[in-house]
């Protein structure tokens, strides 16, 4: 009999399996798709030779993840590549704010009135970032905090809405860039603890950057898989699980699935009926015949580029999908240009580029024209560079990854208490009413992103139970 069976070979499922295998527990992973990866895949979606990431592409949380940093993934082929700038945010007047590795360069891009407030905000936490990241990404605490004082101070700043934190800034550049950071997890700007979201992304950039993985995000999943196999673990693909009886006998079952799917597989009825799914996105992957023709200079060397004219426009774009069930007329866009840092992603002289905007959960429209109008505001002539595009709305995203219910790439609404306490209000979020079944997906803390911490934290709960039985 196996000690543990993991369902789902995304970053969290693979990390959970690795953590258990490292401690000597026989483990096997079962994945419905033909390849491993979940939200960390790479495919040729447009033209031959253009390697696209269907979901996550830039990895500020991955390179800063305590889980990944504790594993020898570089030995198995993972290499982080850094663009000239982690992130840039252009404005209609041709200027831009930047999120640089340098706090000083970032602060200077906001202008004289906001440079000092930004420095003071960041420099309170950056020297203790590694400890803070471990404590924050282990909430609800799976162990005593290593630095409770810094964590408490961070909570005082981060738990209020991001709109409160943005009052520290007087001008629009700092406010707009920070609003865009919050929007990376599709959280409403006025929501509980959204200040913490923006701070985490900013601190992550200053600490270690916002890199891409050489060859694509698939490299992360492949490195985890190779390490797991070296530890004696097994991975089975093309294996759909509809109920626990489909799996071999094991002492523990660890599911990297949505709460809805877990309840169905484990026979838990309506246990997660109150779990809320959030807005979706409409995503476009592009093959380009040259770099994006940004008007501002800074985005040309940035790995990630945020598109929103000001914080008001961003707030409206976030409100429309969740508050009105309409797609925004001027969507806020998160864009990534991996080939700026990794020329292996496209043929010589060509580029890959992706962008997404927010839409209602389950929306079935086409946001292509609205998104490209936004891009043309900041990169005139963009459409002329397009060789091919591959679009994916909520239905296509959910078909690619069953955890994206209704196209929600955050695997659950990132708002209210569900931002921190998910999938239920509990100090033991990885446990379920079934004593042998655990959940390790992004529907558990610390939430969405390719960081493996949900799997890492869940593995702790699993091995504690295995040692007791």
Swiss-Prot record:
S-S bonds: none
Pfam families per the UniProt record, alphabetical: NAD_binding_8
InterPro entries named in the record: FAD/NAD-bd_sf
PANTHER family per record: DEHYDROGENASE-RELATED, PHYTOENE DEHYDROGENASE
Name by which UniProt lists this protein: Protein p49
Species of provenance: Streptomyces lividans
Organismal lineage: Bacteria, Bacillati, Actinomycetota, Actinomycetes, Kitasatosporales
Name of encoding gene: p49
């Amino acid at each position: 009999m196996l000690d543990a069976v993991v369902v789902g070979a995304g970053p969290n499922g693979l990390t959970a399996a690795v953590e258990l295998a490292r401690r000597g527990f026989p483990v096997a992973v079962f994945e419905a798709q033909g390849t491993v990866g979940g939200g960390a895949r790479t495919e040729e979606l447009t033209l031959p030779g253009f390697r696209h990431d269907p979901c996550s592409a830039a990895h500020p949380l991955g390179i800063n993840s305590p889980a990944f940093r504790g594993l020898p993934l570089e030995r198995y082929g993972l290499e982080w590549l850094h663009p000239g700038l982690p992130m840039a945010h252009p404005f209609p007047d041709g200027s831009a704010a930047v999120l640089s590795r340098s706090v000083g360069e970032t602060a200077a891009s906001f202008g004289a009135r906001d440079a000092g407030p930004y420095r003071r905000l960041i420099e309170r936490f950056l020297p203790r970032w590694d400890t803070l990241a471990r404590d924050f990404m282990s909430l609800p605490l799976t162990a005593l905090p290593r630095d409770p004082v810094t964590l408490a101070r961070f909570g005082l700043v981060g738990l209020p809405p991001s709109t409160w934190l943005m009052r520290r800034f007087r001008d629009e550049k700092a406010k707009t860039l920070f609003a865009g950071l919050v929007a990376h997890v599709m959280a409403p700007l006025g929501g509980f603890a959204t200040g913490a979201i923006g701070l985490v992304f900013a601190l992550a950039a200053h600490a270690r950057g916002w890199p891409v993985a050489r060859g694509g995000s698939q490299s992360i999943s492949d490195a985890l898989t190779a390490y797991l196999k070296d530890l004696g673990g097994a991975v089975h693909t093309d294996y759909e699980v509809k109920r626990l009886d489909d799996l071999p006998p094991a002492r523990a079952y660890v599911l990297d699935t949505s709460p809805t799917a877990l309840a169905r597989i484990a026979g838990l009825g309506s246990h997660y009926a109150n779990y809320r799914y959030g807005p979706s996105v409409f995503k476009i992957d592009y093959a380009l015949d040259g770099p994006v023709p940004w008007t501002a200079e800074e985005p040309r060397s940035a790995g990630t580029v945020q598109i929103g004219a000001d914080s008001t426009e961003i707030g409206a774009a976030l409100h429309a999908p969740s508050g009105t069930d309409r797609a925004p007329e001027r969507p806020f866009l998160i864009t990534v240009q991996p080939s700026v840092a990794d020329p292996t992603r496209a043929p010589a002289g060509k580029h890959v580029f992706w962008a997404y905007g927010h839409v209602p959960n389950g929306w079935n429209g086409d946001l292509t024209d609205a998104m490209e109008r936004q891009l043309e505001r900041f990169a005139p002539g963009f459409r002329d560079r397009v060789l091919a595009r591959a679009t994916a709305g909520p239905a296509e995203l959910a078909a690619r990854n069953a955890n994206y219910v209704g196209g929600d790439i955050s695997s659950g609404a990132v708002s209210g208490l569900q931002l921190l306490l998910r999938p239920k209000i509990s100090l033991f979020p990885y446990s379920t009413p079934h004593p042998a079944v655990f959940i390790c997906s992004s529907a558990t803390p610390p939430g969405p992103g390719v960081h493996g911490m949900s799997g890492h934290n869940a593995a702790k709960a699993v091995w504690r139970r295995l040692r007791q039985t």
